[in-house]
């Protein structure tokens, strides 16, 4: 083995509740939609493209409105996670630090820009990956 690649959600932490809280704030602030997202709803769209997520969660909005709201949700989410991190799995930070001494470590995800950085900062592993 010459390196290790990690996914984020379900591997390093569980951010579903924090992401739902951030998206609900964005929805209330930037739209007139009367919806509340939770971990179950978000779990059903995690892993999909942002276009698909917008189509599923915000079907009544125009494409422009969806894009704008999704942008706001993602931006607010990345900032929110810095102060309200997900549930960090036990031993993740220590394990990452130890592994980094022997292997190059990488994170890959199909998430929006800034999410991996917010995750690494929240967990405290940005120096090791």
Annotate the PLM regions.
Residues 23, 95-120:
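Substrate-recognition element of Asp-dependent hydrolases with the DxDx(T/V) motif
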Residues 126-129:
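Conserved H-loop
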Residues 2-8, 12-90, 101, 112:
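N-terminal helical cap/lid subdomain that shapes the substrate entry/recognition surface
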Residues 18-21, 120-124:
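Short, glycine/charged-enriched secondary-structure capping and boundary segments
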């Amino acid at each position: 083995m010459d390196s290790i690649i990690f996914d984020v959600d379900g591997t390093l932490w569980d951010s579903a509740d924090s992401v739902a809280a951030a998206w609900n704030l964005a929805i209330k602030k930037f739209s007139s939609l009367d919806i509340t997202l939770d971990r179950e709803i978000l779990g059903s769209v995690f892993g999909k493209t942002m276009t698909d997520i917008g189509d599923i969660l915000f079907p009544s909005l125009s494409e422009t409105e969806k894009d704008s709201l999704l942008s706001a949700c993602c931006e607010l989410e990345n900032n929110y996670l810095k102060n309200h991190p997900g549930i960090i799995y036990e031993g993740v930070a220590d394990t990452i630090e130890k592994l980094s001494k022997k292997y190059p470590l990488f994170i890959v995800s199909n998430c929006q820009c800034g999410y991996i950085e917010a995750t690494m900062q929240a967990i405290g592993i940005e120096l090791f990956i």
